[in-house]
Amino acid sequence: MCLAVTVLALVGCGDSTLSSKELQTQAEAVQSFAAEGALVAKGVEQARMTETFVRVHTDYLAKAARKVETELSSKQASGSLDRKREDAARLALLVSLNLERLHRHPGDQALARELGSELEDDAAAAEKLAK
């Protein structure tokens, strides 16, 4: 969770033009949120987490991912960097929506299995965007 807070602090800085380094930082943030969400989902699937923990933590992660999506959507970039910015913003939104679903159904093991797999895929996609 400390990593997520540090990443959020870095994500909020800058002007309206997105640099390659900022995109990398934000994509890494999305990767972090998705990977952490996948771990929570795995815990739900294996009945190792309380519903209260799942609700609180997925709410935090979903809001953090949504903040990154908002930041990316408010920035501008040119050429291929703008396409990557759009892809990262869509991915941040998808991560946020998946985390919100887990938040609403913190004890649903079947849904957790599905979302865990999706969040792992999202984390891999975000890692690729960060390169």
Show which residues each predicted segment covers.
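Sec-dependent bacterial lipoprotein signal peptides
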Residues: 1-15
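Alpha-helical segments in soluble extracytoplasmic regions
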Residues: 22-101, 114-129
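Membrane-helix boundary connector in multi-pass membrane proteins
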Residues: 100-109
